[in-house]
Curated annotation (Swiss-Prot):
Component of the small ribosomal subunit. Part of the small subunit (SSU) processome, composed of more than 70 proteins and the RNA chaperone small nucleolar RNA (snoRNA) U3. The keyword Ribonucleoprotein applies. It comes from Dictyostelium discoideum. This is Small ribosomal subunit protein uS7. One of its GO terms (molecular function) is RNA binding. The keyword Zinc does not apply.
């Protein structure tokens, strides 16, 4: 009897793909895990966090800031509830929705400061795939946190809403708004 490894015992990893070629190596969905907790030391070596499952990276990002810092069990529970809501609303695999949300939320272009002898100007630069994924996960969790603050809706509902809107590329999503603002400023600094 062989049983397939599924996230939270429900969501299958088979069929989850990343259509964006540049992000395929950095959005890790190949490691099949039951729960998004590996206790791995992904920050010890440069670029090793690319091997960390994307759901675990979302959980780690969810438990940042203030009163929720370090509460990984709570972060994992929020993600599990959000995935249930996503499945009920979209009838799609929540892992695929997450991959699409991360893919759509990462800015492709940014601006950096270039300065010499006191004069500073901004220059538009392309964003590396690793930074795109990092920034996308950060924007998704920041938008979720902002939506849930002083709101009757639960964090899981806000996370599900943010992921669904970001996967569709909807301007209602906080992460898509921030990405567009970043790319707009980068375009003005070309």
């Amino acid at each position: 009897m062989t049983s397939e490894v599924a996230l939270f015992g429900k969501w299958s990893y088979s069929g989850v793909t990343c259509p964006d070629i540049s992000l395929q190596d950095y959005i890790c969905v190949k490691k099949n895990v039951f729960t998004p907790h590996s206790a791995g030391r992904y920050n010890k070596v440069r670029f090793r966090k690319a091997q960390c499952p994307i759901v675990e990276r979302l959980a780690n990002s969810m438990m940042m800031f203030g009163r929720n810092a370090g509460k990984k069990v709570m972060a994992v529970r929020i993600i599990e509830q959000a995935f249930e809501i996503i499945y009920l609303l979209t009838d799609k695999n929540p892992l695929q929705v997450l991959v699409e949300a991360v893919m759509n939320s990462g800015p492709r272009e940014d601006s950096t400061r270039i300065g010499s002898a006191g004069t500073v100007r901004r220059q538009a630069v392309d964003v590396s795939p690793m930074r795109r994924v990092n920034h996308a996960v950060y924007l998704l969790t920041q938008g979720t946190r902002a939506a849930a603050f002083r709101n009757i809706r639960t964090v899981a509902e806000c996370l599900a809403d943010e992921l669904i809107n970001a996967s569709k590329g909807s301007p209602n999503s906080y992460s898509i708004k921030q990405k567009d603002a970043l790319e707009r400023t980068a375009k003005s600094h070309r």
